[in-house]
């Protein structure tokens, strides 16, 4: 965090020692707990971190409603995200000059206050909220986000989010990644009419006005031709591209069949619904063999089916970075969740995500996974002496190899006061020459 400038950024926003120490504790916990269910107070109490956050009562880190509420203020979000973009631009002037928008539904196990009743993609009506994220196209790092009710973005909501990102942190959106149910006549027309959007890719819904089933018939017998097959993540896909006009606009339609999924689910249906299956016509049986793996992407990018699918799925992976599981969110009493605490939790996770991605990038090429780094590194023990010196135990061979690969030198001891000064936890006592 110190090497990437994140520590200095946080210090510039959180000027009080206790506030700064508190945000460090929460971010370190979010990043380094590595999927475990350990609470923040337990995590800090068992680590070196407890030595450098002395102003924070450990028991207050368990639910910490005030922290998330304070972090959820709009001014805090703008200060942190704007400062982050400026920090990145100091080393890369093009950072944020081209971004794409992705989104993911949030679980409602904690009754998110702004959730709205909807049935989009759920198989029934339920309360949902959605998180839209703007990411820098070159680095994939998040630069802005918005939380809204329901599970479908209409055009006005989407434009508000885009304008908000441009106004608040000065990033420009030129690419849109849209998931199931997003492609509408209104959106297709707007994307083509607005020259800010260099590209867009979205999934075609199976409803009236769209050639969803027509494209299946258009493919005909080619769905069995090997020249249209390609492999991705252990699955074999049929993929074919068509150039066409949709709502008066020239677009590219990419027709896919996940052959493995279609075969598996088709077999399951036949085995469990034998009488119904036998009653189907030959055409209906043929459709049943592919329908569970069939989907269509709509884009204004002329590419190959394999490249388009990789681009679409690759940019849909953003939800994996956000820790919105029931286990973590339920640490706060349900009665304490408000719009501000939800926003604060998301901002905490956004900053943590940036830190996580930067660590992962630094490890690329070393052969180290994040889990291996945090798992092995956490076994290294230390003790603090009365004079403030921290004695670090002799690391075993495996731990030494981990730290060496990560480019980190293991000290035999360190001066706690000097460490706190170097990490901006305390002001320096003397001017540096």
Q: Over which residues does each language-model region extend?
A:
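Dynamic "connector" segments at or just before major functional cores
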Residues: 1-100, 104-110, 134-151, 390-433
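A short acidic (Asp/Glu
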Residues: 110-112, 184-191, 211-214
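Electropositive, glycine- and tryptophan-enriched low-complexity nucleic-acid-binding patches
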Residues: 124-167
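An anionic, glycine-rich sequence signature occurring as long contiguous blocks
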Residues: 127, 146-147, 197-311, 379-433
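Acidic, metal-coordinating catalytic cores used for nucleic-acid/nucleotide bond scission
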Residues: 153, 177-186, 206-209, 340-341
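Short, surface-exposed basic-aromatic patches at helix termini and helix-loop junctions that form
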Residues: 167, 188-198
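Short amphipathic alpha-helical "interface-anchor" segments enriched in bulky aromatics
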Residues: 307-335
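Basic, amphipathic alpha-helical segments enriched in Lys/Arg and hydrophobic/aromatic residues
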Residues: 337-360
